[in-house]
Amino acid sequence: MADELLVGTVAAAEQQPGARAPALLLTLDLGTYGTAQAVLPGQHDPDDIRDTQLVCRREDDGAIVVAAHSHGKGMVPLRPDVEVEPGTLVS
C-alpha cells in the first residue's frame, strides 16, 4: 500500500544536476517493497548519506524523504536511532 511511512536504506546518492537548488537524487532500498527514488533537497554530501537509513513516505511513483526544516541546518532527514530492516514500517 502506498502512503506509508517506512525506513529505507540509501543504496545510491548523487548530486542532481540541473536542479534549481542543491539536491541529491537517492535510490532507496525498501526491503520487500522494492526500490524507490527520492529527492533530498539541501547541501548534503552523497558519501555521508549513502548506506544510511532514512524515514520516507512510499508513494505509487517513488518516495518522499521525511525531514525537518531547521533554519540553521536546512533540511534534516529523520533517521532511526538503530539500524532496522529496510522496509520496516514506522508507526
Spans of features found by a protein language model:
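Phosphate-backbone binding interfaces of nucleic-acid-interacting proteins
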Residues: 1-91
